[in-house]
Design a protein with these regions (language model features):
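RNA substrate-binding interface of SAM-dependent RNA methyltransferases
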Residues: 1-51
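Structured adenosyl-cofactor binding patch, chiefly the S-adenosyl-L-methionine
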Residues: 4-21, 77-113
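Short flexible/disordered coil segments
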Residues: 40, 63-70, 106-113
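Active-site/ligand-binding-proximal alpha/beta "capping" segment
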Residues: 44-95
Length: 113
């Protein structure tokens, strides 16, 4: 979407170590619009919420879409609403949230179990 980073910016290409050229990408005006157009896919919104399903007990479908927001603002409400499932990473201690890359990594690790 227009408010996402440029996947071909030098920082992204360097940070991905070239993986950006081996992964499929989709450009859409809005994430929620894409999710609504592809309702056949299961979709998960990563949120900080006690009412969301814990990733440790979520049976992830394949293929699926997982939306992870940035550290400052999280996901837009329209994106959360468009996702079929709300998931959260159970945390102990005082930390309220995680860096988006760390959160995405943890979610993908759980998905691969």
């Amino acid at each position: 979407s227009a408010d996402c980073c440029d996947i071909y910016s030098p920082k992204v290409v360097r940070g991905s170590m070239g993986a950006v050229f081996r992964l499929p990408f989709v450009v859409s005006d809005t994430i929620s619009g894409f999710l609504n157009a592809h309702s056949e896919l299961e979709s998960y919104a990563a949120v900080v919420s006690a009412s969301a399903d814990k990733i440790t007990t979520t049976p992830f479908a394949s293929p699926c879409i997982v939306a992870v927001g940035n550290e400052g603002n999280g996901l837009k409400e329209e994106t959360i609403s468009a996702c079929k499932h709300k998931i959260t990473i159970p945390m102990e201690g005082r930390a309220e949230s995680l860096n988006a890359a760390v959160a995405a990594s943890i979610i993908m690790w759980e998905m691969m179990k």
